[in-house]
């Protein structure tokens, strides 16, 4: 089985079927395109679906627009069609990220991708069914990172 080298802001927890994305700084089309490419590479050939936790608390600037977010959401909705249901939790406190997160919630309704936006890490962990410690561990340097993921 081939391994996928993950970028530094992505962890994959094979044991609990969870991808964690913790970007820092600017969130723009390039950043979103990069994480979508990682997600799609991991989805190829996987029998087990995996949930996603997007911790956007490290974002300092947002440069996105409505058309791009809509197009990216439609692309994901179509590329995930026919797959088992997954959850995508977005932790956001920035107004722009909250706005775009809620837009994603609306655009994915009725699809196999269930998106929910949270302002509280504990609520996101509970919704995903994972330990809250896992969500916060990397920020304190305690998490053992998986740098490679099997597709």
Question: Which stretches of residues belong to each language-model region?
Answer:
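Amphipathic, Lys/Arg-enriched alpha-helical "gate/interface" segment within cytosolic domains
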Residues: 1-151
């Amino acid at each position: 089985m081939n391994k996928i080298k993950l970028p530094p802001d992505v962890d994959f927890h094979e044991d609990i079927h969870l991808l964690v994305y913790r970007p820092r700084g600017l969130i723009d089309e390039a950043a979103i395109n990069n994480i979508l490419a990682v997600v799609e590479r991991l989805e190829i050939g996987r029998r087990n679906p995996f949930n996603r936790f997007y911790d956007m608390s490290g974002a300092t600037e947002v440069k996105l627009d409505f058309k791009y977010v809509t197009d990216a959401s439609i692309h994901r909705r179509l590329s995930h069609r026919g797959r088992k249901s997954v959850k995508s939790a977005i932790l956001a406190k920035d107004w722009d990220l909250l706005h775009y997160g809620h837009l994603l919630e609306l655009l994915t309704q009725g699809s196999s991708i269930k998106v929910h936006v949270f302002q509280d890490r504990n609520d996101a962990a509970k919704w995903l069914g994972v330990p809250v410690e896992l969500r916060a561990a990397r920020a304190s340097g305690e998490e053992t990172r998986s740098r490679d993921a099997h597709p």
